[in-house]
Amino acid sequence: MLSKLRRWLREGLILLALLAGAMLLMDAWRAPQLPASFDSTPLQTLDGETVTLAALSKDEPVLLYFWASWCGVCRFTTPEVARLRSEGENVMTIALRSGNEAEVSHWLSRKGVDFPVINDANGAISRSWAISVTPTLVVMSQGRVVSTTSGWTSYWGMKLRLWWAKTF
């Protein structure tokens, strides 16, 4: 009986390692390709504030969240990103081809979401970054990319990535 349990445990650990490896490979394959001046390009939020990613990530890591109003998976990730923002985490979001500023603002208010948004109405930012999947999350610290992932990510997954960027 004990040997059977050990075998199941060993096989479970092997399966877990294979799944983790596959997830890491998929993240590497879908990782954004950043343009040369990505950190110093001025970007404007819906509130009219002009920001650069270098400035946003200078003092503390920033979570960049590429999302879309039409993205099915984003409906699960967006509330968790808003929760991080309400807890004081440094968050900037980019709305990918989700309409004009009024439409994006209306969508945000309808969903009860409050976080800063850069509207990428025509997809120029996402094209220059080679973002092919929504949602995509990028953690930056001091102007450099620390981690990227795409697809569904849990609150704790995002929190852990930000903690890692702050700590190391």
Could you describe each region identified by the protein language model?
Residues 9-26:
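Hydrophobic membrane-insertion alpha-helices, especially the h-region
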Residues 63-64, 91, 137:
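Hydrophobic beta-strand anchors of alpha/beta hydrolase catalytic cores
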Residues 44, 116-120:
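Short acidic-hydrophobic, aromatic-tinged amphipathic segments that line or gate anion-handling sites
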Residues 22-54:
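N-terminal "domain-start" segment that seeds a small globular fold
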Residues 52-75, 81:
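Short active-site neighborhood of thiol/selenol oxidoreductases, capturing the structured segment around
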Residues 1-8:
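Short, Lys/Arg-rich N-terminal segment immediately upstream of the first membrane anchor
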Residues 75-111, 121-127:
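Structural microenvironment flanking redox-active thiols in thiol-disulfide oxidoreductases
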Residues 109-113, 121-166:
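Thiol/disulfide oxidoreductase modules built on the thioredoxin-like
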